[in-house]
Amino acid sequence: MDIKIKDFEGPLDLLLHLVSKYQMDIYDVPITEVIEQYLAYVATLQAMRLEVAGEYMVMASQLMLIKSRKLLPKVVDDADLEEDLEHDLLSQIVEYRKFKLLGEKMAEQHEERALYYSKPKIELVYEDAELVHDRSAIDLFLAFSGLLAKKREEFRHSHTTIVKDEYKIEDMMDVVLERCKSQKKLALQELFTETKDMNEVITLFLATLELVKVQEIQLFQEENFGSIYLIRK
């Protein structure tokens, strides 16, 4: 089964999504938390052997530099450089948001003008105006990155010898649906409590993503950064 994760338009689009979850001025967001979420997203993609575009890796390197400088003891010159790097990053996100909103407005105006003409509408070629992403799936992906790290640590300290099985996404989809059927809402972390190895964890997650994609289950989150629940439709 070929599962494709919808990409953002680029690293700035992903960062904009992450900072927007804080619902505050971009310059006031806890930048270290945002950086950790971004790096966790990229690391999870790599752990699942999914392709990561080069531009995301370049941004990851820049973010790791900012994060490392924030963790080091403060030196006057370095502190100034750290503030400059952080301010430059946030300014890029602010500018990108302006550009994105402008693109969306242009797309809306194009749609409105098309209503007044009888001839077929010409599609507006403006990639940044699209920006249609499956945010629910991305939020699920970000939540999974934390679970993945915990399960990896759990298996590392486990002394149980386990024979690795071959897991199929189709079979795991049935498992997820059955679990959701037996409970009104299923917390994401509960889905992975009985997993035996990383192959099972990853296959189970891919099955969950596919069920979201085909709209057999929906995701529910009471608040930003809160627990994610699965509900069968």
From Swiss-Prot:
Domain of life per record: Bacteria
InterPro entries membership: ScpA, ScpA-like_C
GO cellular component, as recorded: cytoplasm
A Pfam family assignment: SMC_ScpA
Record GO biological process: cell division; chromosome segregation; DNA replication
Compartments where found: Cytoplasm
Keywords: Cell cycle, Cell division, Chromosome partition, Cytoplasm
Primary role: Participates in chromosomal partition during cell division. May act via the formation of a condensin-like complex containing Smc and ScpB that pull DNA away from mid-cell into both cell halves.
Subunit-level organization: Component of a cohesin-like complex composed of ScpA, ScpB and the Smc homodimer, in which ScpA and ScpB bind to the head domain of Smc. The presence of the three proteins is required for the association of the complex with DNA.
Family: Belongs to the ScpA family.
Protein's name in the database: Segregation and condensation protein A
